[in-house]
């Protein structure tokens, strides 16, 4: 009877209340994707048709996993900027409906570390959700810009948006998720 009640409780427990668990083999340079829970996240997923609305890069795994990402409101003390968050902060249920991690295996370990360091150099810089032609700085572009500095031939799909206040070409997390030679971590 106790087992049945426990199973019923687990089935009825909203998944958003369960904290995400980091993959055991997460390494510096891996990408962490998040399906956010807010309206902006829903809009991003709608506009792009992708599963995820946010992305960050692992810059440290010890003593704790640290993820650098550009965000508007993850941390009220540091709004609209590039920040470093712990994995538990990045994947907290109020912010994350779903989390996934991927390793860009088209880069070797040293290049992934260089990529992470290049993104981390943007810490504290302001968040700019602007079109491609206007020097954007948001979650996807800080990783992509560092990536093309390492591998200039890399090309990701920019999506043209034609909405009031959002007109031009934008790079969504799904574009990085579609790059060849990504290894999705269990």
Model-derived regions: residue spans:
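Bacterial N-terminal signal peptides that target proteins for export
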Residues: 1-7
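Bacterial N-terminal signal peptides
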Residues: 7-16
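Boundary at the C-terminal end of the N-terminal hydrophobic targeting segment
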Residues: 17-23
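Loop/turn positions that initiate beta-strands
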Residues: 28-30
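Glycine-rich catalytic cores of cysteine/serine-nucleophile enzymes that process amide/ester linkages
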Residues: 34-100, 125-137
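Sec-exported extracytoplasmic/periplasmic mature domains
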Residues: 60, 120, 124-127, 147-152
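Stable alpha-helical elements in mature extracytoplasmic
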Residues: 111-119, 135, 139-142
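Activation targets extended, charge/polar-rich intrinsically disordered C-terminal tails
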Residues: 130-186
């Amino acid at each position: 009877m106790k087992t049945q009640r426990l199973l019923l409780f687990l089935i009825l427990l909203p998944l958003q209340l369960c904290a995400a668990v980091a993959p055991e083999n997460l390494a510096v340079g891996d990408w962490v994707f998040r399906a956010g829970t807010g309206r902006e996240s829903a809009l991003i997923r709608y506009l792009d048709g992708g599963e995820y609305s946010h992305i960050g890069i692992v810059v440290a795994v010890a003593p704790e996993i640290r993820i650098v990402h550009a965000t508007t409101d993850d941390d009220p003390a540091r709004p609209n900027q590039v920040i470093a968050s712990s994995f538990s902060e990045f994947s907290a249920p109020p912010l994350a409906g779903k989390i996934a991690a991927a390793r860009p295996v088209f880069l070797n370990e040293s290049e992934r570390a260089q990529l992470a360091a290049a993104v981390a150099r943007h810490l504290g810089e302001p968040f700019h959700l602007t079109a491609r032609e206007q020097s954007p700085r948001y979650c996807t572009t800080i990783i992509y810009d560092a990536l093309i500095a390492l591998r200039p031939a890399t090309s990701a799909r920019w999506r043209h948006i034609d909405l009031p206040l959002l007109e031009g070409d934008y790079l969504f997390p799904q574009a990085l998720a579609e790059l060849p030679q990504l290894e999705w971590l269990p």
